[in-house]
């Protein structure tokens, strides 16, 4: 049942997600593409986490943050992708009121955590390049744990503000969300109550998160670039800058898309364009992050080669021993 009668009002109990398209051919194509992206996202980020855990060479603060970033990327993608895939197969694709709030809250929580993790990683690079002698002190295990825990706490705080805003909205009319997941903008459009308070609270909260993390990242990289330019050796400059390129690429993709979706005036682009940007933000970027950090990072590539080399060597020894035993038994 999509509606309940509450006195003189009709209360929405479930929503219909319209998804990306109604074209049956395009739906099949998109289903295949997004399913492949999701599988690569989960496998790629899990591989990153496992590689960091098993490789002692990667037991450094930067990779500690990266392992948490990979976990968050799996969560972000998993919060919307399974439901999006179901939308391609089932019509209409409904989601309950509580289910919508859970999806909405989890997406906000994980995106906020990612913002602060990216800021923590920028600070880590700042200390490593600008204050290398103090690196072991400033980026101790305790400090790294505090930064990660702080990221999750900020995620919970921001998600709580968005959750309260969601439950302050009353839905008594149309229940068709013109999106592939429960996002704030289409929910506000469907609300039949005053949305001013909800919009103000979420705008202030999201604005604070964005400005704080962007400020930390901008200051960190400004100091990094100044330090790099002061280096006399070209090789030293290249080595220092190469340690930042992966993170800088990830930051540019994440914040560039975020700014376009949530900062640009809605009149400047259509709802369909917003959906495409949201797919890139929620589905594609979590897949790209492990590729960015692995392809542009010599330490990760080296650890992967060593790990695969050990596996191949152990399997080779096992095969030789088995073959040797079989030969002598004959």
Curated annotation (Swiss-Prot):
InterPro entries: GPCR_Rhodpsn, GPCR_Rhodpsn_7TM, Olfact_rcpt. The chain crosses the membrane at residues 29-49, 58-78, 103-123, 137-157, 200-220, 241-261, 275-295. Disulfide bonds join 100-192. Residues 1-28, 79-102, 158-199, 262-274 are extracellular. Glycans are attached at residue 8. GO terms for biological process: G protein-coupled receptor signaling pathway; sensory perception of smell. This is Olfactory receptor 5P70. It is found in: Cell membrane. It is a multi-pass membrane protein. The keyword Nucleotidyltransferase does not apply. Potential odorant receptor. GO terms for molecular function: G protein-coupled receptor activity; olfactory receptor activity. The keyword Disulfide bond applies. GO terms for cellular component: membrane; plasma membrane.
């Amino acid at each position: 049942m999509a509606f309940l009668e509450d006195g003189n009002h009709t209360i929405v109990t479930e929503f219909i997600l319209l998804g990306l398209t109604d074209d049956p051919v395009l739906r099949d194509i998109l289903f295949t593409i997004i399913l492949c992206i999701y599988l690569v996202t989960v496998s790629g980020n899990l591989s990153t986490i496992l590689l960091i855990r098993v490789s002692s060479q990667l037991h450094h603060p930067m990779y500690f943050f990266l392992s948490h970033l990979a976990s968050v990327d799996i969560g972000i993608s998993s919060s919307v992708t399974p439901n999006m895939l179901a939308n391609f197969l089932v019509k209409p694709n409904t989601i309950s009121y509580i289910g919508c709030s859970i999806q909405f809250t989890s997406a906000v929580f994980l995106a906020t955590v990612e913002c602060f993790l990216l800021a923590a990683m920028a600070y880590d690079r700042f200390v490593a390049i600008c204050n290398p002698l103090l690196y072991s002190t400033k980026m101790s295990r305790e400090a790294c744990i505090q930064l990660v825990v702080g990221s999750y706490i900020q995620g919970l705080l921001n998600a709580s503000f968005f959750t309260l805003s969601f439950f302050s909205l009353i839905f008594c009319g149309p229940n068709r969300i013109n999106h592939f997941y429960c996002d704030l903008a289409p929910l506000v459009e469907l609300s039949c109550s005053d949305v001013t308070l909800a919009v103000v609270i979420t705008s202030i909260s999201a604005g604070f998160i964005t400005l704080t993390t962007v400020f930390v990242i901008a200051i960190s990289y400004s100091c990094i670039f100044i330090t790099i330019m002061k280096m006399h050796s070209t090789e030293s400059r290249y080595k220092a800058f190469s340690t930042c390129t992966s993170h800088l690429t990830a930051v540019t993709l994440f914040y560039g898309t975020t700014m376009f979706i949530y900062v640009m005036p809605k009149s400047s682009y259509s709802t369909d364009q917003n959906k495409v940007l949201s797919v890139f933000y929620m589905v594609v970027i979590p897949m790209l992050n492990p590729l960015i950090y692995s392809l542009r990072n010599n330490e990760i590539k080296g650890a992967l080669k060593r790990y695969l080399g050990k596996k191949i060597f152990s399997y080779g020894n096992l095969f030789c021993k088995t073959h040797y035993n079989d030969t002598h038994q004959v």
